[in-house]
From Swiss-Prot:
It is found in: Cytoplasm. Its main location: cytoplasm. The keyword DNA damage applies. It comes from Desulfitobacterium hafniense (strain Y51). GO terms for molecular function: DNA binding; excinuclease ABC activity. This is UvrABC system protein C.
Length: 607
């Protein structure tokens, strides 16, 4: 593939519209990729085009929906890269989105991978659930749409077939051997033919052939019953029922036993919904939904999604069925077809209808949530005399008897958690430091920082406490000349949210069934969770470090080195001398750590 920067790239970035117009006039009549940048030079959107000139110019002409217009208003500059073909442009777009993670390219930003079941190629094979397909490691079946479905199938396989369960072969038989769920390579030499047999049977099960297994289980159940082994007979009966349940879930089938995905989509003015049905061995296993805003034509956004999704796929199905549209670019990369008739076309239509239903449900939920959030903010604002309430920041102090004192701050924007603005604070120790003094310190630090960086202040501060913490927060704000309303969330005897108390010590009770009360309760629970989680992390870290104190040759850097390698103090405690040296410790320090945690064992052994 050959990518050529277009002539527009030699023009320096500038937000001046005259420069942008000049760059637009130089755009080529060729396929390629464009990168939109904001005033700071950050890439905010990456797109592909069959004709760069037409596509890029379209952003600066005509009308657009609200979300697209918002993105366009941030564009201060752009770059283009010319490619030899649409296929190369599509692949380059995928790579650049993955590399730059632009704000407005939200398609598959998590690089989602799907789980597979593998029967390993080990001498004593195992059944594993994995998201990594490695050549030569075993036979893979899937993908499954989620880990729960894969684990459920693997659990059933391990009950049906005596594969090895242990990661390493132990020195003596485990419980699975005694239950007949393992051939016991730790006890006997298992011939290869025995494993080949269960491999074949398990593969048939994963391909949807359950008839032979059900007959074998029914025969074993009858034999156990005749021998008065009723518990064993019950186990076989339960296995048969589980097997039938799996079969019942796969109620849409194609008789050719081909692995295929069926994809449909639906869209509104600014949102796109994509629905994927996963058929494996001709049977529908499950489905997946993706809903996101788009900033180009919906068909183009759909094609970009498919390219990203299947480029990242660990293993492609044999066939991907799509609705009618121009997929000439995609068919050069993936096994995609547009069925014209029959059951395959019906499946695509079903995926399209499901996408439409899912999108409609999502929009209904968003409207309902928006209405409730608007109502909740209005109720809280009316109670406290705040006419326009959008941003709420809430604080909670967490400690045990004044030790490991920390604070958590959360932000809700338009009634929803804005997690990018969550903050953690370690309280700086001072004489007579109690919760009110801690609150004063944290409020002062938070809003002094916002003032220094010229960032917007919230519309309301909520503290998880009473009058003392409210007045501490007000005093801190007064020292900064910051006028922000402050209120406290009062709890009842059961430690549940009950009311608001304002800066004048007035109690404002809200109807427990109201949207405003539900929002307050959610904020109080969330800030408490966030603060106490941080406190526990700090306390555990402190306890871990203190347990390593005093070991000769192990200073702060080596303590951190050990924790980074072993992850926990328990793992360090159980490590062998060789493992301690593998962590990077020199031999004397490793010996000192080993001796520190094992001396009592040796003393007990000697006694």
């Amino acid at each position: 593939m050959h990518y050529r920067p277009s002539p527009t790239r030699i023009i320096p970035r500038c937000s001046n519209m005259e420069i942008l117009r000049e760059k637009l006039s130089l755009l080529p009549d060729k396929p390629g990729v464009y990168l939109m940048k904001d005033a700071s030079g950050q890439i905010i959107y990456v797109g592909k085009a069959k004709v760069l000139k037409n596509r890029v110019r379209s952003y600066f002409t005509g009308s657009h929906n609200g979300k697209t217009q918002l993105m366009i208003s941030l564009i201060a500059d752009f770059e283009t890269i010319i490619t030899d073909s649409e296929v190369e442009a599509l692949l380059l777009e995928c790579n650049l989105i993955k590399k730059h993670n632009p704000k407005y390219n939200i398609l598959l930003r998590d690089d989602k991978t799907y789980p597979f079941i593998t029967i390993t190629d080990e001498a004593h094979p195992r059944i594993l659930v994995t998201r990594q397909v490695k050549k030569g490691a075993g036979k893979y079946y899937g993908p499954y749409p989620n880990a729960t479905a894969a684990k459920e199938a693997a659990r059933l396989l391990n009950r049906l077939f005596p594969f090895r369960k242990c990661r390493q072969i132990p020195n003596k038989p485990c419980l699975y051997y005694h239950l007949g769920q393992c051939l016991g390579p730790c006890q006997v030499d298992v011939p290869k033919e025995a494993y080949d047999k269960i491999r074949k049977e398990a593969a048939a099960f994963l391909k949807g052939d359950q008839g032979a297994i059900l007959k074998a289980l029914e025969k074993k159940m009858k034999e156990a019953s005749e021998n008065l082994e009723f518990e064993r007979a019950k186990e076989y009966r339960d296995l048969m029922e589980d097997l039938k349940k799996v079969g019942e879930k796969q109620n849409i089938t194609l008789n050719d036993f081909v692995d295929r995905d069926v994809v449909g989509y639906a869209y509104t003015q600014d949102q796109l919904c994509i629905q994927i049905f996963y058929l494996r061995q001709g049977k529908l296993l499950s489905r997946d939904n993706f809903i996101f805003p788009y900033y180009e034509e919906p068909e183009e956004a759909f094609v970009s999604f498919l390219a990203q999704f299947y480029t990242e796929s660990s293993a492609l199905p044999q066939e991907i069925l799509l609705p009618p549209l121009d997929i000439s670019v995609l068919t050069k990369l993936f096994p995609m077809v547009v069925p014209q008739k029959g059951q395959k076309r019906d499946l695509v239509q079903m995926a399209m209808e499901n996408a439409q239903t899912t999108l409609h449900e999502q929009i209904s939920i968003e409207i309902r949530n928006l209405t409730e959030c608007t109502q909740a903010l209005a109720e809280i604002g009316n109670a406290l005399g705040i006419p326009s309430l959008r941003t709420i920041e809430s604080f909670d102090i967490s400690n045990i008897a004044g030790t490991h004192s920390v604070a958590g701050m959360i932000q809700f924007l338009d009634g929803k958690p804005n997690r990018s603005q969550y903050r953690k604070f370690k309280i700086q120790p001072m004489p007579n430091m109690d919760d009110t003094a801690s609150m004063h310190q944290v409020i002062e630090r938070r809003y002094a920082r916002l003032q220094q960086e010229n960032l917007p202040l919230p519309d309301l501060i909520l503290v998880d406490g009473g009058k003392g913490q409210i007045h501490a927060a007000l005093a801190a704000l007064h020292s900064l000349n910051a006028a922000i309303p402050v209120a406290g969330m009062v709890k009842n005897d059961k430690h549940q949210t009950s009311a608001l108390i304002d800066a004048m010590d007035r109690i404002h009770s809200l109807d427990r069934r109201s949207a405003g009360f539900r929002l307050l309760e959610r904020i109080q629970n969330e800030v408490h969770r966030f603060a106490i989680t941080f406190h526990r992390q700090q306390r555990a870290k402190s306890m871990t470090l203190s347990e390593l104190d005093g070991i000769a040759g192990v200073g702060p850097k080596r303590r951190q080195q050990l924790l980074k390698f072993f992850k926990s103090i328990d793992s360090i405690r159980q490590a062998t001398l060789e493992e301690l040296q593998q962590s990077g410790l020199p031999a004397p320090a490793a010996a000192a750590v080993y001796q520190h945690f094992n001396s009592h064992k040796e003393e007990n052994h000697d006694s």
